[in-house]
């Protein structure tokens, strides 16, 4: 019997200003869905897998075809409902309602675990949407580069006087998210040694210029790192190997990186983490015929890697969990002090979240890189005093290869996001851009996620696991007129450990879009400021007052 999730076809988004749907508000999700499965973007496009283990864009290829066909015929007073990658209904709404509403991987909490999800998945009743895979706004590894860069820069500021020159970062994983690490490290001025078990992924990062070199030899990798750091060069190398083997070996040798982290797909112990002593081929085969054995061996291996990370931490080396839930897996395997080292959000990112600053991104539906160059210039024009952001944009232009439709990631917050959106819409209206722009973000944002082992770890008031916030975020973005809105479970850290929401809005050059953009791109980051103000963070409380937010039970207004 043929696999409904496997097809050798090649999918690429249409380019240019010619519509395939009835309006740009339906053309936009159509193009971004297809862009998610572009072979230059997705990790395993023939299996509908975009990134993050088994994060898919659609449940089956038949469902993909149905979504495409429906978007092509959808009217401006209709909304398509997508349930875990399956187009289940079209309903009459109104022109300011989202054209698509998406719910992916959501389970009643008692059943929210990998075993139950995998059973549903096997029966064709569910799909893992990760964060931006099933919400159709993945832009390749660039999508996480700036966040990783900001993290490394802040780590350098806290631990090394703001200068990472001559320093190096040890990490694991070069998948859709982890692949950003070597480039982010180099941009921050550091060298990077990234361990990756699947050579095809390392080759993907070489091809897209996210990593500089590749080796199968630990000795060679260390020699290169030593030479580069002594010369003050910032370069990166991918080491083909297993992080659960390499990390302990480095501890044994007494090697001391300057920063240690990990972005293997440890959140998914069946599909995301190679067990010690296994070949990749053996691992892939047993995922299908003996997933329990894979999970058991992978979890045991994660414990070994986390113990090595603890050894680095205890040696005084800054060590952080980069949000893949590997500490939780090790804890469940009996490593009682697995959480001794922090996650990256409480360690480095939370002050940004308190001001609603997060991973704002946009893509040029024209397919023309010049449209991104023009929007980059507009960002600089509108935010003339943000030299750190200007530096990022300059480096991004020089170092980041576009994957699929040209796109840009740019961390900005409440008070700036809507200004940029309105400016982009004006550029579409006056013909400065060749076609509309879509603006979205990662679900990893200040007000759109509840994830106690990642974004909401160690909240000041203990509200780490309260998931009302992403639900309110999704509801508000729907009411505000986002073009499509998504509500997911399990992204980043796996089943049972997170709930999160996403939104995308289209700048089609119309005055209606102006009104929607002003609402959505103000309200969306404002929920993040609200969430952190409610938790008692002074930065968020001050920012809420400065921006004039009305928060009755928080500010008394």
From Swiss-Prot:
Residues 1-20 are annotated as: Disordered. It is found in: Cytoplasm. The active site is at 410. Disulfide bonds: none annotated. Its EC number is 4.2.1.49. Pathway: Amino-acid degradation; L-histidine degradation into L-glutamate; N-formimidoyl-L-glutamate from L-histidine: step 2/3. It catalyses: 4-imidazolone-5-propanoate = trans-urocanate + H2O. One of its GO terms (biological process) is L-histidine catabolic process to glutamate and formate. Its main location: cytoplasm. It is an enzyme of class 4 (lyase). Binds 1 NAD(+) per subunit. PROSITE patterns: UROCANASE. NAD(+) binds at residues 52-53, 130, 176-178, 196, 201, 242-243, 263-267, 273-274, 322, 492. GO terms for molecular function: urocanate hydratase activity. InterPro entries: Urocanase, Urocanase-like, Urocanase_C, Urocanase_central_sf, Urocanase_CS, Urocanase_N, Urocanase_Rossmann-like, Urocanase_sf. Its cofactor is NAD(+). Keywords: Cytoplasm, Histidine metabolism, Lyase, NAD. GO terms for cellular component: cytoplasm. It holds the Pfam family Urocanase_N. Belongs to the urocanase family. Catalyzes the conversion of urocanate to 4-imidazolone-5-propionate. This is Urocanate hydratase. It comes from Brucella abortus (strain 2308).
């Amino acid at each position: 019997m043929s696999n409904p999730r496997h097809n050798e076809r090649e999918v690429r988004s249409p380019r240019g200003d010619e519509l395939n749907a009835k309006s740009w508000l339906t053309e936009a999700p159509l193009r971004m869905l297809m862009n998610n499965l572009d072979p230059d973007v997705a990790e395993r496009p023939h299996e509908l897998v975009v990134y993050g283990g088994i994060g898919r864009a659609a449940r089956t290829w038949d469902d993909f075809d149905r979504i495409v066909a429906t978007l092509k015929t959808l009217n401006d007073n209709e909304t398509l409902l997508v349930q875990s990658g399956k187009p289940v209904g079209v309903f009459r709404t109104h022109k300011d309602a989202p054209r698509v509403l998406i719910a992916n991987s959501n389970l009643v909490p008692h059943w929210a675990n990998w075993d139950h999800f995998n059973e549903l998945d096997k029966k064709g009743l569910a799909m893992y949407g990760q964060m931006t895979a099933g919400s159709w706004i993945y832009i390749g590894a660039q999508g996480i580069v700036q966040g990783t860069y900001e993290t490394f820069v802040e780590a350098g500021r806290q631990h090394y006087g703001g200068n990472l020159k001559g320093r190096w970062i040890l990490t694991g994983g070069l998948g859709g998210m982890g692949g950003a690490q070597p480039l982010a490290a180099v941009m921050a001025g550091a060298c990077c040694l990234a361990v990756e078990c699947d050579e095809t992924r390392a080759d993907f990062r070489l091809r897209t210029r996210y990593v500089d070199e590749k080796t199968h030899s630990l000795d060679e990798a260390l020699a290169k790192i030593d030479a580069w750091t002594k010369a003050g060069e910032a370069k990166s190398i991918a080491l083909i190997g297993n992080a659960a083997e390499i990390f302990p070996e480095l501890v044994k040798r007494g090697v001391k990186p300057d920063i240690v982290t990990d972005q293997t797909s440890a959140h998914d112990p069946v599909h995301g983490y190679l067990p010690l002593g296994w070949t990749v081929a053996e691992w892939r085969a047993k995922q299908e015929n003996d997933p329990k054995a894979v999970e058991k061996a992978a979890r045991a291996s994660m414990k070994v890697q986390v113990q090595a990370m603890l050894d680095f931490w205890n040696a005084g080396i800054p060590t952080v969990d980069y949000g893949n839930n590997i500490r939780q897996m090790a804890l469940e395997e009996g490593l009682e002090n697995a959480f001794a080292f922090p996650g990256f959000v409480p360690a480095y990112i939370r002050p940004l979240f308190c001001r609603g600053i997060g991973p704002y991104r946009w893509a040029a539906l024209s397919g023309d890189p010049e449209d991104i160059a023009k929007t980059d210039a507009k960002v600089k024009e509108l935010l003339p005093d943000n030299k750190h952001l200007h530096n990022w944009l300059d480096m991004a232009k020089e170092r980041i290869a576009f994957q699929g439709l040209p796109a840009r990631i740019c961390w900005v917050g409440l008070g700036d996001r809507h200004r940029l959106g309105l400016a982009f819409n004006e550029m579409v209206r006056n013909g400065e851009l060749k076609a509309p722009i879509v603006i979205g973000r990662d679900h990893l944002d200040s007000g759109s996620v509840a994830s106690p082992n990642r974004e909401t770890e160690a909240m000041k008031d203990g509200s780490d696991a309260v998931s009302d916030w992403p639900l309110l975020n999704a509801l508000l973005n729907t009411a505000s007129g986002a073009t499509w809105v998504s509500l997911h479970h399990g992204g980043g850290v796996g089943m049972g450990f997170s709930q999160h929401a996403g939104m995308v809005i289209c700048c089609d050059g119309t005055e209606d879009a102006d009104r929607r953009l002003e609402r959505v791109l103000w309200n969306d980051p404002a929920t993040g400021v609200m969430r952190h103000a409610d938790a008692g963070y002074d930065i968020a409380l001050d920012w809420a007052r400065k921006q004039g937010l009305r928060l009755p039970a928080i500010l008394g207004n």
